[in-house]
Amino acid sequence: MTKKEQALIEQYAKSLVEVASEHHSLDALQADVLAILETFVTTNLDQSLSSLAVPHAEKIKLLTLLKGNNSVYMNNFLNLILQNEREAYLYQMLQTVLNEIAIVSNQYDVTVTSSLPLTEEQKSRVRAVVAKKFAVTAGRLIEKVDPSLIGGFIISVNNKVIDTSIRRQLQAFKMNLK
């Protein structure tokens, strides 16, 4: 992706977040974006929208299906994308919208990787640790299970990581023995 394309994507995303923020609709926008991104993942819609083989009329039909229960701001955004023929960039724009919402609201997704599934008590403790250590509000808690960690956990928030896994400790111990 070129710098020009990246700047275009960021401008569209920032504008949408700015409008939603002015109207106190960030939560609704975030829900809309997550639902549409889920559709992208389950249907490979991104490939269809970015393909030159798919006619513009077909792309209009596909995006019209996405307009269902969205907020006014999201539907206006989708109309603007269609009008300016920027469908190929929609997936990246929506990803950038989520990043912008996180920055504006200081609310980031938290990814927790552990060797076993977390209990509700552990999840609430993770949220407390995230709030204290990273000075952010925990957004969605994304839980991953990786038995190779042996024990402990890895918390990842906004490109920052806390790794207390036994696997990492064993690797560090192994390096110290060399």
UniProtKB/Swiss-Prot annotation:
Compartments, as annotated in UniProt: Cell membrane
Signal peptide: none
Coiled-coil ranges (or none): none
Keyword hit for RNA-binding: no
Membrane topology, from the record: Peripheral membrane protein
Single GO molecular function: proton-transporting ATP synthase activity, rotational mechanism
Main location per the UniProt record: membrane
SUPFAM superfamilies noted in UniProt: N-terminal domain of the delta subunit of the F1F0-ATP synthase
Keywords: ATP synthesis, Cell membrane, CF(1), Hydrogen ion transport, Ion transport, Membrane, Transport
Homology family: Belongs to the ATPase delta chain family.
Self-association state and partner proteins as the record states: F-type ATPases have 2 components, F(1) - the catalytic core - and F(0) - the membrane proton channel. F(1) has five subunits: alpha(3), beta(3), gamma(1), delta(1), epsilon(1). F(0) has three main subunits: a(1), b(2) and c(10-14). The alpha and beta chains form an alternating ring which encloses part of the gamma chain. F(1) is attached to F(0) by a central stalk formed by the gamma and epsilon chains, while a peripheral stalk is formed by the delta and b chains.
Function: F(1)F(0) ATP synthase produces ATP from ADP in the presence of a proton or sodium gradient. F-type ATPases consist of two structural domains, F(1) containing the extramembraneous catalytic core and F(0) containing the membrane proton channel, linked together by a central stalk and a peripheral stalk. During catalysis, ATP synthesis in the catalytic domain of F(1) is coupled via a rotary mechanism of the central stalk subunits to proton translocation. This protein is part of the stalk that links CF(0) to CF(1). It either transmits conformational changes from CF(0) to CF(1) or is implicated in proton conduction.
Protein known as: ATP synthase subunit delta
Gene name in the database record: atpH
